[in-house]
Amino acid sequence: MTMMDMNFKYCHKIMKKHSKSFSYAFDLLPEDQRKAVWAIYAVCRKIDDSIDVYGDIQFLNQIKEDIQSIEKYPYEYHHFQSDRRIMMALQHVAQHKNIAFQSFYNLIDTVYKDQHFTMFETDAELFGYCYGVAGTVGEVLTPILSDHETHQTYDVARRLGESLQLINILRDVGEDFENERIYFSKQRLKQYEVDIAEVYQNGVNNHYIDLWEYYAAIAEKDFRDVMDQIKVFSIEAQPIIELAARIYIEILDEVRQANYTLHERVFVEKRKKAKLFHEINSKYHRI
């Protein structure tokens, strides 16, 4: 195993640890594509964790400087400051793919702002956040998952990322509240007459369910729109993207089956993932 192989393996471990659903799906890509996904996922995870886990603004700055070095001089040797193994893997990807570096910087800017979290006044602000933390990831992955990236390809990948982030929010309402965060907008909370603190303490009510389903309908519509345009991605990537997205959309039904609880995190069981895999395998005849 070469040093570069070890770098990618390190990135893969990060992906498997933090996103079993993504790993389950994207590990089915051809080798070069899945390695690129591992590297990009690991970079994005380190960006997220720099503040959420480490509380280290200097580390986030180092990540940004390392990415800038790769963008400016992709073929030169660099003394990376953040995580050398991840950055070497990203540099290798950047030498072969047209990486949308600005999307990394947009993600970093969102993480900067997230240090001083305040509730969103409107849904527009919420959806802007979903773009910043997840739509950006879709943009960065676009050259990996498509043969000829176009404006439409970037748009579809961005919408998929935003949809998956909204699903994360719908899954983690209780956990986020425990961390003193409410992502639903004040505008919509007022409209549906919902107080998350009250729901957390006293239990789910019809007002909360209606609010939750309002946002779930948005995520489900975006999911359907992405599936309708799945052919913008490469033949190899289409079934993988559909598998990842369908596993994620299943999370919404898991929340419903758990009576919209705010006191436990739901997940999609392995047997359901396997069932989806076989369905999509039959549809595409190529996974």
Curated annotation (Swiss-Prot):
Mg(2+) 1 binds at residues 48, 52. One of its GO terms (biological process) is carotenoid biosynthetic process. This is 4,4'-diapophytoene synthase. Involved in the biosynthesis of the yellow-orange carotenoid staphyloxanthin, which plays a role in the virulence via its protective function against oxidative stress. Catalyzes the head-to-head condensation of two molecules of farnesyl diphosphate (FPP) into the colorless C(30) carotenoid 4,4'-diapophytoene (dehydrosqualene). One of its GO terms (molecular function) is metal ion binding. PROSITE patterns: SQUALEN_PHYTOEN_SYN_1. The keyword GTP-binding does not apply. (2E,6E)-farnesyl diphosphate 1 binds at residues 18-21, 41, 45, 171, 248. Its EC number is 2.5.1.96. Coiled coil: none annotated. Mg(2+) 2 binds at residues 168, 172. The lineage of its organism: Bacteria, Bacillati, Bacillota, Bacilli, Bacillales. It catalyses: 2 (2E,6E)-farnesyl diphosphate = 15-cis-4,4'-diapophytoene + 2 diphosphate. Its cofactor is Mg(2+). Keywords: Carotenoid biosynthesis, Magnesium, Metal-binding, Transferase, Virulence. It comes from the Bacteria. (2E,6E)-farnesyl diphosphate 2 binds at residues 45, 165. Binds 2 Mg(2+) ions per subunit. A third Mg(2+) ion binds between the 2 farnesyl diphosphate (FPP). Pathway: Carotenoid biosynthesis; staphyloxanthin biosynthesis; staphyloxanthin from farnesyl diphosphate: step 1/5. Belongs to the phytoene/squalene synthase family. CrtM subfamily. The keyword Metal-binding applies. CDD domains: Trans_IPPS_HH (cd00683). Pfam families: SQS_PSY.
